[in-house]
Amino acid sequence: MPSANLHPIVLTGVIGLMLLIRLRCTFTSTFSLPPLVTLNQIIALSFCGLLLNSISRAERACYYNYSVDSSKQQHISISTPNGK
């Protein structure tokens, strides 16, 4: 099932394609092939996509606790979705 917000996924794909296209790549012949994508590039782009997707789905919650002596404590928790 696709996520509710596809913008980070599309952005990751566009950035990945821009990184894979090299400006120095000039084809000397009509039949020359583009440079192959290496396994390191695939792993790096997959990790970046996973990281961006996790960041975009994280929920931030701030809790303020007041004590008797009027001091303020702040508790910040960042939770990720449970996959539902």
UniProtKB/Swiss-Prot annotation:
It is found in: Host endoplasmic reticulum membrane. Keywords: Host endoplasmic reticulum, Host membrane, Membrane, Transmembrane, Transmembrane helix, Transport, Viral movement protein. It is a multi-pass membrane protein. One of its GO terms (cellular component) is membrane. Residues 26-30 are cytoplasmic. GO terms for biological process: transport of virus in host, cell to cell. It comes from the Viruses. The chain crosses the membrane at residues 5-25, 31-51. Residues 1-4, 52-84 are lumenal. The keyword Disulfide bond does not apply. Belongs to the carmovirus double gene block protein 2 family. Cell-to-cell movement function. This is Double gene block protein 2. It comes from Carnation mottle virus (isolate China/Shanghai). The lineage of its organism: Viruses, Riboviria, Orthornavirae, Kitrinoviricota, Tolucaviricetes.
